[in-house]
Amino acid sequence: MAKVSGRSKKTIVDDEISDKTASASESASIALTSKRKRKSPPRNAPLQRSSPYRGVTRHRWTGRYEAHLWDKNSWNDTQTKKGRQVYLGAYDEEEAAARAYDLAALKYWGRDTLLNFPLPSYDEDVKEMEGQSKEEYIGSLRRKSSGFSRGVSKYRGVARHHHNGRWEARIGRVFATQEEAAIAYDIAAIEYRGLNAVTNFDVSRYLNPNAAADKADSDSKPIRSPSREPESSDDNKSPKSEEVIEPSTSPEVIPTRRSFPDDIQTYFGCQDSGKLATEEDVIFDCFNSYINPGFYNEFDYGP
């Protein structure tokens, strides 16, 4: 047998080592490739919608269907960019949320916009929305939604409080800015709680300046007493025709209360009757005195 030289043995060993190194590097590259494999869809891929209807999404926690509309012609609340999302309410049924979007889209963009359902099914609604502004109509849609009322009541503007289980009354409207809503709340708070109400702005800005000025002018004018006739009948004497009396102290000015507009937004919550009454307590105390105590028991033990 031919003897294998030492040089040949060394060549064979080197070939085996190179083969093992190549296989190891190949397996490492395969593992690295599988590790870097993208599991999420690419960014340019369309997002998966939670509802097939236009303008409808399902809330991941509550399970309700929310309707939204994108108003590209309006500015957002911070006035940093054009366009804002308009909330149309939360609904238990997906179809109801889709119809709410259709009605809002018809109010914003007219009959040529894309809808979820055929246009003829909204003929009566289109006639109803003609006499209302966008804000008023959107507010009416929200009030009809399932998320508007937290409790079950047959009365308009009445809902069960989610903390103490009692009933609360609401009346409101939609404002364009936070300042307008704050002023509306201040006016309602002063009307129902008096000048000691906690307001967002100073109370003096809500007093009628014209009435206060007229009252101040009337107080500053001297009070004239009727002329006294002289005791003697002598015509040559010039009797004192009038006497000027200056008031020592001006009477206290009672500020007038402003009338409460019907469309002002405010919130009136029913507090727990077991607590001591303070200046911020329930504004309907005068109304409670006329109610039979059994009226509240009927609701407290209800479903």
Swiss-Prot record:
Q: Which InterPro entries match?
A: AP2/ERF_dom, AP2/ERF_dom_sf, DNA-bd_dom_sf
Task: Offer one example of a GO biological process linked to this entry.
Answer: ethylene-activated signaling pathway
Cellular-component GO terms for this entry: nucleus
Which residue ranges does the Swiss-Prot or TrEMBL entry mark as DNA-binding? 52-118, 154-202
Give positions of region: Disordered: 1-55, 212-259
According to the record, the segments passing through the membrane are none
Q: Where is the composition biased (Basic residues)?
A: 1-10
Q: Where is the composition biased (Basic and acidic residues)?
A: 214-243
Gene Ontology terms for molecular function:
DNA binding; DNA-binding transcription factor activity
| Intracellular or extracellular location(s) | Nucleus
Polar residues composition-biased segments: 20-32
- Tell me the keywords, alphabetical order: Activator, DNA-binding, Ethylene signaling pathway, Nucleus, Repeat, Transcription, Transcription regulation
State the PANTHER family in the record: AP2-LIKE ETHYLENE-RESPONSIVE TRANSCRIPTION FACTOR, AP2_ERF DOMAIN-CONTAINING PROTEIN
> What family does this chain come from, according to its entry?
Belongs to the AP2/ERF transcription factor family. AP2 subfamily.
Instruction: Name the job this protein performs.
Output: Probably acts as a transcriptional activator. Binds to the GCC-box pathogenesis-related promoter element. May be involved in the regulation of gene expression by stress factors and by components of stress signal transduction pathways.
Q: Quote the protein name from its UniProt record.
A: AP2-like ethylene-responsive transcription factor At1g79700
Q: Which organism is it from?
A: Arabidopsis thaliana
